[in-house]
Regions:
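Phosphate-binding/catalytic loops
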Residues: 76, 82-143
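Conserved active-site segments centered on acidic
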Residues: 1-72, 140-143
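Short, charged/polar low-complexity linear motifs in solvent-exposed/disordered segments
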Residues: 31, 77-78
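Helix N-cap/beta->alpha junction signal
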Residues: 70, 81-82
């Protein structure tokens, strides 16, 4: 099973979700993309440092924009916000598009830490980790 995490710029939330999912859940493979990626942008320094500290994982790559091929390959497309979910559905359609909180049985959006301090990044990281732990307990992820 392939899972695709989507956020705005593919510099904070979706790369964190990708690494958390891949490092903690080994029955599927995750990737991440952004809806509005600035050419040459990379994962934020704060997100990178947290992932290095928590998982020993150095994410050093350019942000990638969501493309048709990504949509075709993924069984689940998981956004961080309702607005992102609507945008993905507008562009590509989408019976397989959910927000992370929706899949976890919660409502609302995962806060965007972009431009904030490390404390906010840590809160976002912790929230994403908690939500991913929750969704991977469901039968649909236990195949």
């Amino acid at each position: 099973m392939k899972v695709l995490f989507v956020c705005t710029g593919n510099t904070c939330r979706s790369p964190m979700a990708e690494v958390i999912f891949n490092e903690t859940y080994h029955k599927a493979e995750a990737a991440s993309r952004g809806l509005f990626v600035q050419r040459g942008s990379t994962i934020s320094r704060e997100a990178r440092e947290i992932l290095q500290r928590e998982y020993g994982y150095d994410v050093d790559r350019e942000a990638e924009e969501l493309m048709d091929l990504d949509m075709a390959d993924a069984e689940y497309i998981i956004t961080m916000t309702e607005a992102q979910k609507r945008e993905v559905k507008r562009r590509y359609g989408g019976e397989r598009v959910y927000t992370l909180k929706e899949l976890a049985g919660e409502s609302g959006d995962v806060m965007d830490p972009y431009g904030m301090n490390e404390e906010i990044y840590l809160k976002t990281f912790s929230e994403i980790r908690k939500l991913i732990h929750k969704i991977t307990q469901f039968d649909k992820f236990r195949r």
